[in-house]
């Protein structure tokens, strides 16, 4: 009886000693401040950033950022669907800490925003051309040899700089880069079919949506057009200039998501392929 009493008293003393430790740990965790991060995103950029049928934020970039959020207990991401203009102005001013819109890097954006080390997604870009020339045009290099006669591109477009870069690397096999007065030429596919130009530099997703998809406005020409990808252009989240600590946390989380296969799996879900396979180091 005395032995049982001693054991009971000993157990009680241990519980009294340990309980304050658990209480302190629980109190410390509950007092940890979780900072709300306002993330602006575009609403119609399928499959990168958009609103689903219920009005919820969806898309590949959104999904990656949600996965990033799960790895950062000190932050809670709140998503805001906004216009392209509101995203840029709001992120620069600090109304939003992050903006995501499938953005390519430009010199102007480097001046206005903090660009992290790791991209968020990638846009696959290439050329659409007449299917009858498919035996001669296999890539951008063979197109340059074929004629290099490309639909004019606005100097304000990121595509312009991509072709500039190609020409710099291929001084003896250049593409005819003609500046356009407008950002987007509505009849580009028709101009190619009419032999006015021999190719149209366009995003793969745009080609699939407008030509290959049965409801696409140019689907009737699907058998007369062909497409070859050139490369994947990384897209980046835009951070407010003051958010260096947040950007560093993002970079660390994205690296983890790359290594554990999450980003590749999400790319397969939203694009049907791993778009980073087209991105050269």
Please give the residue ranges for each predicted region.
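Bilobed "Venus flytrap"/periplasmic-binding protein-like clamshell domains
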Residues: 43-46, 54-70, 127-174, 178-184, ...
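A ligand-binding cleft/hinge motif common to bilobed small-molecule-binding domains
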Residues: 86, 92, 100-112, 161-165, ...
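Bacterial N-terminal signal peptides that target proteins for export
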Residues: 1-9
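Periplasmic-binding protein-like
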Residues: 42-44, 121-126, 214-254, 273-281
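Acidic, polar ligand-binding/catalytic clefts
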Residues: 66, 78-144, 223-229
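Extracytoplasmic small-molecule ligand-binding "clamshell" domains
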Residues: 28-103, 181, 260
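Ligand-binding clefts/hinges and TM-proximal coupling segments of bilobed small-molecule sensing domains
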Residues: 23-25, 75-78, 154-177, 220, ...
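Extended ligand-binding regions for polar small-molecule ligands
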Residues: 62-72, 131-134, 141-145, 149-152, ...
């Amino acid at each position: 009886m005395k032995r049982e009493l001693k054991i009971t008293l000993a157990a009680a003393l241990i519980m009294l000693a340990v309980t304050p430790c658990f209480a302190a740990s629980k109190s410390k965790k509950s007092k940890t401040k979780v900072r709300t991060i306002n993330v602006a995103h575009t609403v119609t950029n399928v499959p990168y950033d958009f609103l689903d049928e219920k009005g919820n934020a969806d898309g590949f970039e959104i999904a990656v950022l949600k996965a990033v959020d799960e790895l950062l207990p000190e932050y809670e991401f709140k998503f805001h669907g906004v216009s392209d203009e509101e995203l840029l102005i709001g992120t620069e001013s600090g109304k939003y800490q992050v903006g995501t819109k499938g953005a390519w890097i430009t010199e102007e954006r480097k001046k206005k925003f903090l660009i992290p080390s790791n991209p968020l997604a990638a846009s696959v870009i290439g050329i659409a051309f007449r299917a009858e020339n498919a035996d001669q045009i296999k890539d951008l290099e063979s197109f340059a040899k074929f004629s290099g006669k490309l639909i004019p591109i606005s100097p304000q477009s990121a595509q312009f700089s991509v072709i500039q870069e190609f020409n710099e690397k291929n001084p003896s096999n250049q593409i005819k880069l003609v500046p356009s007065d407008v950002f987007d030429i509505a009849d580009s596919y028709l101009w190619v079919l009419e032999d006015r130009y021999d190719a149209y530099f366009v995003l793969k997703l745009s080609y699939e949506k407008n030509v290959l998809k049965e409801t696409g406005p140019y689907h009737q020409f699907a058998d007369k057009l062909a497409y070859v990808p050139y490369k994947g252009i990384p897209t980046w989240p835009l951070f407010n200039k003051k958010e260096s600590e947040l950007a560093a946390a993002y970079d660390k989380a994205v690296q983890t998501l790359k290594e554990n296969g999450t980003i590749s799996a999400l790319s397969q879900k939203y694009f049907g392929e791993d778009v980073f396979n087209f991105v050269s180091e």
